[in-house]
A protein has these predicted regions:
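Conserved active-site and cofactor/substrate-binding residues in soluble primary-metabolism enzymes
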Residues: 5, 9, 25-29, 71, ...
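Divalent metal-dependent phosphate-bond-processing catalytic cores, especially two-metal-ion Mg2+/Mn2+ enzymes
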Residues: 19-24, 30-41, 58, 109-199
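Acidic/His-rich, divalent-metal-binding segments that scaffold phosphate/diphosphate chemistry
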Residues: 1-68
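Divalent metal-dependent catalytic cores for phosphoryl transfer on phosphate-bearing substrates
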Residues: 47-149, 161
Length: 199
């Protein structure tokens, strides 16, 4: 399967199991951050970038149907195995959830953990900006909101911090990196300011 087909198959898998628009947008956001990380930390090959992107895209594909700790990401892992996804992809997805006990050893596994919560948090920060735009988000605004425990309560701040540490990068640098990775897909995420103009 070539890289375009593989990405299309991953998108179809996501949409088959995930109806929520916000979960689909989260998947796209993590995919964008993972592709950027692959260019920075991976081999630099298009195949590598595609694989890292797919991991980001489908890391939570089973969550809407099976949100419990007993099921997610285990149910998804079974489906991925049935559909022929590699051990490398499946292991990375299992490793993004602390409670699975699967250690994060490869750069791809570490990147998924480092991007998952942060991508969601950056999106939440953009949504409260007057223009609902990623262009209004910077590292300072993200760090400020991280201190506000009432804001985006479900996002684990410790995971964001630990993720950057595991990658061996400064937290502010990682936040800025992910903001930049998300900007090209801002229209797909509804974070290009058009939502504010329409409202």
């Amino acid at each position: 399967m070539n890289k375009i087909d593989a990405r299309e198959a991953a998108w179809q898998l996501l949409t088959e199991f995930t109806q929520s628009e916000s979960l689909r947008k989260h998947a796209l956001a993590v995919e964008a951050c993972m592709r950027a990380c692959a260019r920075k930390l991976g081999s630099g090959s298009p195949e590598d970038e595609n694989q890292w992107g797919i991991v980001g895209l489908i890391h939570d594909f089973d969550y809407e149907r099976w949100p419990s700790l007993e099921d997610h990401p285990y149910k998804g892992n079974e489906i991925l195995k049935e559909r022929g996804y590699s051990d490398e992809i499946r292991r990375a997805i299992l490793s993004h959830a602390e409670y699975t006990g699967v250690t994060r050893d490869s750069p791809m596994e570490k990147a998924l953990f480092a991007c998952d919560e942060l991508a969601g948090f950056i999106t939440a920060v953009a949504l409260i900006k007057p223009g609902k735009s990623l262009a209004e988000v910077d590292t300072k605004s993200v760090r400020k909101r991280m201190k506000d425990k009432a804001f985006a309560r479900k996002v684990n701040r410790d995971d964001i911090i630990q993720g950057a540490t595991a990658l061996g990068v400064d937290l502010d640098e990682h936040i800025a990196f992910c903001i930049e990775a998300l900007k090209p897909i801002a229209p797909q995420l509804g974070l290009d300011g058009s939502a504010a103009k329409a409202g």
